[in-house]
């Protein structure tokens, strides 16, 4: 009986962590301009059969659902997933952030960036400056931690990026969602998985 109560308590906590302060936001999908586009089977997504740009393999980091569900400090907060992206009009940094907003297509992983609006990404002297809109920034400490980890770990996989400086509406802030300091550029070494 105690095990069942513990499991129900953990599930309730998980729902509270994930569901608190989340407002569903519909994100408009830009039209894809191609000749004879074909939707992927089982989806509404249209894929350009001959994308412009160079295909690059990148390592993205997504939230570990085991960590979210159990809260076990021994579990890694984010896990790597390799993905091919097309770099053309947008930089590799911008494409990484766009990919982080998409579902990882893996039951063990999830993303916490689906509601975050990225305004710009610029890189200078080994620092990626990620500018996000303040209007969609809400969540508890777990959500904020996972958003920061996903972005910092994914961008610092690139050879020329050592740290990430977060900006909110173009300005430095103390925190992203009220819990973790983002006043200085964050390095991968600043965190422990």
Task: Map each language-model feature to its residues.
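Bimodal "functional hotspot" detector
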Residues: 2-193
